Amino acid sequence: MEMTGWRTYRRPDDKSGGHGVGWSPIIPYSFKVPDGWDEVPVSIADLGGTEIDLRFANPKEGRLFVIVAPVRRFADDLDDATIEKIGNPEKVITAFGPEVIGENVEGKVLSTATAERSGRTYYQFELEPPHVFITATAAGNRLYLFSVTANGLQWKRHYKDLKQIAESFRVV
């Protein structure tokens, strides 16, 4: 499905990432963004304990980031993790939502959906406040959290696009 004025970002295979010993290369991921969204450098200072792999933003529409975290922090050592092995949607959002929004997610989850694409399961959440879509999946020995967020005005104006960005996330 090609959308006019949209482009696909795919994580380069040779992009560095991962920390410490025993890290395998990150399985690449991709997503679609409208024109005008650009990569924003990730500074070590803004990590705040989370493993942010990538940031994108559009000053008028919103911003997104990708967290790639080792599964072993949350589950027994899995080399071929699936999101289902980590837990059901409720367990996943309760455990990882705070990594994304910086606070407890209780009472903030508006909707939860499960989607299967190319044999991989994705959990999709909509939270507010803050306004955020989170898409979660697992691959290899990592958990992927894709977060698309915006302020109130951006959310109102660009809700459809923001949701489309969130739903376009794939681990390749």
Q: Where are the predicted features?
A:
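N-terminal targeting sequences that direct proteins away from the cytosol to non-cytosolic compartments
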Residues: 1-133, 138-172
